[in-house]
């Protein structure tokens, strides 16, 4: 059933003869991806085959064909299924003595061996058709066969329903890529990128420009990979984004820039992050925030797969403050409710000391979420897990309140809740018989963040018990805007750091606060969120050199010498400009429903940042390091140096 599902998506639309005008082979994945005058790609041009395995139909009966592919499986030495990236076709193994050599090749070749066969397209015997297979009405009566390459014993079966560990899949990635799931993911990714390029360059005049991947270290942001140079003590860095280059392109008058950009971040072990990733990078001159948003909405509409429901634009928008107050996060999953409600007024006269203490503070508040049908799905141990989670991760207390079947309040704290408070809480939160209320108190941001986490934990628990909250077929986009421009540093709360990056322009109405209360300034930044995942972030940039220098030097205490090239460029008539970067890996992962971004990247790294197939990163000999004036200090060497009071370094030049 699973294989048939993917085959139908993979091979849909292949029944017409090649050369006629129609949707391309993968156009069945998207209503928007097919140009009205586009012809089917000639998949068999320039190669030693006449057809692909997935395109043959009853309309080809009697035709002589040559096919190349992998042996998917074989049954009773009577027939086998041949597979290529376009689909499957049944091959009838000849049984007569005159074709003994052909039979020997096809019967003795191991599964996943590569063969080329030639023969005639014939109908399957009545009753033996396979309606789940796009080529299920026909089979190939083979006349000649050639073993192109035999396959040795496989480390795992190449079938989507066969479970493999991720480590094994990454070690033998070239085999894992043969699966229909990976074929579908990568081809859909390719087609979405093609349509994005078409939308931006052909329809809206963007210029596709490659920017350098060898750059210099920049202040702030994520850690960067260093690349040694032949100058002693000097290093390049791999850019975490083309941010500075695309701004410089606007100074250079390119007006509209686009790139499928490779980016790099040395973030260590992150379960679902990659040290190298791809983003759709965009920058425009003379644009405001709404212009970028409308462009991106049109871009996604144009490139959206046709087997999904069409996108409705414009996407809804929400301020950062609203997102935090309602969902407890700046990237809310709006597919389900369970919104945060401020119930401070309900408990102004409460006898609960925990709530009294919170409300007595200037920023104190009481917040709650209602888990609809929670009593139906959640168990006692689930409630205990939620309470321990709050204490362990937030040092906060959570009060579970629920109604039993007789509509009597049942809670460890029930005796402290007055009748008026119960009725008002039930009214304000629209509590039903099987609902559970999770209530907490404290400083606004901390209380909201806690309930935002519990909201997702409860959704996980409910879905684990059989409830349906987050429909995977629903794609809920949301713009989040009006972020704070600066945040207090965790290690030094009196100092500021950029909430996103130091090139974001402040809201025009907040510029005066830069010189008096910079922590209150909002930035012209906007994030695009899909189903609780940030898939894009952008901003209107600072194009005034004096303002950029003030923010870097005075507010952020950064060394402006590192950005002297950018500051100098802004002094030479930089236009107003803004842009955005969309995370391609994350976007395709969500569109395909893949469990990890590693399932939509051809050759990803493991969660530890390693290439399990090639064993990268690898050691380098001292002779190879010599031109770079680098000497490696191994851990034992570092310990010895520490003992002798010499500062240890992993790299010395």
Swiss-Prot record:
Q: Give the stretch annotated as transit peptide in the record, renumbered to this chain.
A: 1-46
Q: Which SUPFAM superfamilies match?
A: Class II aaRS and biotin synthetases (SSF55681), GAD domain-like (SSF55261), Nucleic acid-binding proteins (SSF50249)
PTM Phosphothreonine: list the residues: 218
Give any Gene Ontology cellular component: mitochondrial matrix
Name the catalysed reactions: tRNA(Asp) + L-aspartate + ATP = L-aspartyl-tRNA(Asp) + AMP + diphosphate
- Does the UniProt entry include the keyword Lipid biosynthesis? no
Keywords of this entry: Aminoacyl-tRNA synthetase, ATP-binding, Ligase, Membrane, Mitochondrion, Nucleotide-binding, Phosphoprotein, Protein biosynthesis, Transit peptide
Where Phosphoserine occurs, residue numbers? Answer: 241
Q: Which PANTHER family match?
A: ASPARTATE--TRNA LIGASE, MITOCHONDRIAL, ASPARTYL/LYSYL-TRNA SYNTHETASE
Q: What is this protein called?
A: Aspartate--tRNA ligase, mitochondrial
Originating organism? Mus musculus (Mouse)
